[in-house]
Amino acid sequence: MIIPWQDLDPETLDNLIESFVLREGTDYGEYERSLADKVADVKQQLKRGEAVLVWSELHETVNIMPRALFNG
């Protein structure tokens, strides 16, 4: 189930994004990027509709994923 990111308290949203970024450990190429920059990038992807917040009833967790991969 998609959770509208706009419905979350801004601090809660930031915490979810930060947790996601730290968990993913994505390689950003030749230059390391700050946590704040990574969080800002994910937030922009949510705002543009490229990524979605997804609640998993099975695992009782929230995840962030590309909208194109969500098939719920």
UniProtKB/Swiss-Prot annotation:
InterPro entries to which the protein is assigned, alphabetical: UPF0270, YehU-like_sf
Disulfide bonds: none
Domain of life: Bacteria
Entry-linked Gene3D superfamilies: YehU-like
Family: Belongs to the UPF0270 family.
Name of protein: UPF0270 protein KPN78578_37030
Organism: Klebsiella pneumoniae subsp. pneumoniae (strain ATCC 700721 / MGH 78578)
